[in-house]
Amino acid sequence: MSVDSIRYKSYNNVIDTLKCIGEKHLNIKTVTSGDIWTIDLEKNTLFPLFHINPVNVTVGLHQRTFNFQLFLMDLVEPDSSNEQEVLSDCLEIMNDIIAIYKHGEILYKFNDEAGEEDRYFINDDFTIEPFTEEYDNAVTGWVMSFAITVENELNTCNIPIDNTTICVK
């Protein structure tokens, strides 16, 4: 395994890592990704639900920042009697996700060439906003903007292009 395959992460790596964290968290029952309007909130969906909504990617000379909206939601009783409890539980799970990216050993792989080093970088502070929606089920939870920065290399040496001719016209 080359050092580059460890350091430079693709969109697939970033999404799959977020999904894995959600799938391994013992309090999350369903993990989905894609546009927020594609969430299936039918009565057969298992909750709490963790949804990853891609927003955009910012590419810089040495880094790529993947911007997401992360949703964590659970069912609310028809009379909303458990809304405070649901909000509290979902907020703790959101806090867990931040903690895993800040300090979680499951995001590190030791490699003799690269050593143990961060592969994913996140901000220090997050604003997490509550929401309530009524579909087939009434759900409440939290949404936060979550930016994941990874190393990037804008290197023309590895581009699969026929460079036998110059493209300047």
Where are these regions (language model features)?
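Secondary-structure boundary elements
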Residues: 24, 151-153
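Short, charged, solvent-exposed linker or helix-capping segments at domain edges/interfaces
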Residues: 81-83, 155-162
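Acidic-leaning, charged glycine-interspersed low-complexity segments
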Residues: 41-46, 91-150
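Ampiphathic alpha-helical segments that act as solvent-exposed interaction surfaces
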Residues: 21, 86-90, 139
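Small/polar-rich, solvent-exposed N-terminal microdomains that initiate assembly or binding
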Residues: 1-63, 109-114, 158-159, 169
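Short, cationic low-complexity segments
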Residues: 99, 163-169
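Short, solvent-exposed beta-alpha or beta-beta edge segments that form flexible loop/patches at the rim
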Residues: 28-85, 121-138
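Extracellular/virion structural assembly segments
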Residues: 2-16, 61-65, 72-105
